[in-house]
From Swiss-Prot:
Cellular localization per UniProt: Cytoplasm
Source organism phylogeny: Bacteria, Bacillati, Cyanobacteriota, Cyanophyceae, Synechococcales
CC annotations in GO: cytosol
GO biological process annotation, one example: tRNA N1-guanine methylation
Reactions mediated catalytically: guanosine(37) in tRNA + S-adenosyl-L-methionine = N(1)-methylguanosine(37) in tRNA + S-adenosyl-L-homocysteine + H(+)
EC number: 2.1.1.228
CDD domains (UniProt xref): TrmD-like (cd18080)
NCBIfam families xrefs: PRK00026.1, trmD
Gene name, Swiss-Prot/TrEMBL: trmD
Organism: Synechococcus sp. (strain JA-2-3B'a(2-13)) (Cyanobacteria bacterium Yellowstone B-Prime)
Role played: Specifically methylates guanosine-37 in various tRNAs.
Protein name: tRNA (guanine-N(1)-)-methyltransferase
Family in the record: Belongs to the RNA methyltransferase TrmD family.
The keyword Lipoprotein is annotated on this UniProt entry: no
Residues binding S-adenosyl-L-methionine: G111, L131, G132, D133, F134, V135, L136
InterPro entries per UniProt: Alpha/beta_knot_MTases, tRNA_m1G_MeTrfase_C_sf, tRNA_m1G_MeTrfase_TrmD, tRNA_m1G_MTases_N, tRNA_MeTrfase_TRMD/TRM10
């Protein structure tokens, strides 16, 4: 898979893309990342990529010409998405990462200043993506988050594929609690079921923990995911164990 990042600060990506699973994936050729500076495509002697907004206002707006020219210079793979990283975009979530991981190429447009000329949004980008309901100084951090989230889904990046299936958001639920040695630490013990060797009981406990944790922390996720009768029962039992007297779950 090929990532092309259009950024005024290509040096921002040098270290993060060399470390961890993403760094290994790039070394192994599972994915490749290329940075292009739109300033290299500015045509005036000062290599300006921004200008004052028409109609007045504070700040500077990124000009369309350098970004259109930079994108036109890139090799294209199919299917490709040209993604504008902006707070106005579609929220980045696991479902979107899974969709983007099916593409052959992602071109990421990183903004600065007051944002992009609207013609970049309308006639160049094919999608807008947001990291959340907050504003950063630029699109570089969202670009890194998107690359990290997509690359780890590519075949060969994560050693155990099953670990991807059970983690948070993959089934519309948060992940279950994880424990390792020692079995007791400062008086806090690992749940006995995890030491029992009963794989069916462990799977049931883990699903119950996912349901309870999601209900407590992200009820919005459960609103989007119909529960089976078994899951409703597991959730009710799990909540009753934590909060005696709770024996009904709103369906």
């Amino acid at each position: 898979m090929r990532f092309d990042i259009l950024t005024l600060f290509p040096e921002f990506f040098e270290t993060p893309l060399r470390i961890g699973l993403v760094g290994k994936a790039l070394q192994q050729g599972i994915a490749e990342v290329h940075c292009t500076n739109p300033r290299d495509f500015a045509t005036d002697k000062h290599r300006r990529v921004d200008d004052e907004p028409y109609g007045g206002g504070v700040g500077m707006v990124l000009k369309p010409e350098p970004f259109f020219a930079a994108v036109a210079s890139l090799p294209r793979l199919d299917p490709c998405e040209i993604i504008l990283l902006t707070p106005q975009g579609q929220p980045l979530n696991q479902a979107l990462l899974q969709e983007l991981a099916q593409k052959a190429q992602l071109i990421l447009l990183c903004g600065q200043y007051e944002g992009f000329d609207e013609r970049i949004r309308q006639y160049l980008a094919t999608r807008e993506v947001s990291l959340g309901d907050f504003v950063l100084t630029g699109g570089e951090i969202p670009a890194l988050a998107l690359i990290n989230g997509v690359v780890r889904l590519l075949p060969g990046t994560v050693g155990k594929v099953d670990s991807l299936k059970s983690e948070s958001f993959q089934a519309g639920l948060l992940d279950y609690p994880q424990y390792t040695r020692p079995a007791e630490f400062q008086g806090h013990k690992v749940p006995p079921v995890l030491l029992s060797g009963d794989h069916q009981a462990i799977a049931r406990w883990r699903l119950q923990q996912q349901l309870v944790r999601t209900w407590q922390r992200r009820p919005d996720l459960l609103a989007k995911r119909p529960l089976t009768a078994e899951e409703q029962q597991l959730l009710a039992e799990g909540l009753a164990e934590q909060h005696p007297g709770v024996n009904d779950v709103e369906k």
